[in-house]
Amino acid sequence: PYPLYLTQLMGGTIIDEAYEKNFGQQNSRESILELQYDGSTTVNNTVNTYLSIYEGAAFKPKHMALDPQLISGYGSVNPIIGFGRTDLRMVETAYLQSPDIAKPLVKFTASTVSVNKPENMSDADAFINYSTRTATSNNAHWPVYRLADMMLIKAEAIARYNATLGDNADKNQLREGFKLVNQLFKRSNPALVGS
């Protein structure tokens, strides 16, 4: 019921179409407002300066890196303690193969992501493949608002409003809020729910 991009399972490998469309390509159907960069006249230097760059066949962290605590519980599936082992958002965010404790960020530097072991991306033999943008031609648009953001904002508003109603909470609204969040969870964890 929601016009979200989904992941594709091809021969045991997850092709993360949602990441590619939203962060690799520009102006996806899920995008509501994006800052535009063309990679030559306007380069996304925010990514190059603060997040990471890809040069010399490696992701190199800049001023920001992923807090190791977000991946300390990566072996489990418990969103309260950080990313779970089946959560595509982890490999969309950080370069797990880095030997550094604080992993370099890959979001906006990587243009595509694929994973051969989606049921446990924390395994040493899980192969995560990225297509990347170079520092000198980073054309990654910066999504300010996406459909996923609006879905989460709506679910949060439903939950907060109904919390004030106590026993009179609207069960239909609560179901709608749950469906919104669950749709995003299923997209990010295809190994748990199938494709």
Language-model features: locations:
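Elongated scaffold/linker segments in the mid-to-C-terminal portions of large proteins
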Residues: 2-162
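Intrinsically disordered, low-complexity Ser/Thr- and acidic-rich flexible linkers and loops
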Residues: 164-171
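Boundary/linker segments of alpha-helical solenoid repeat arrays
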Residues: 191-194
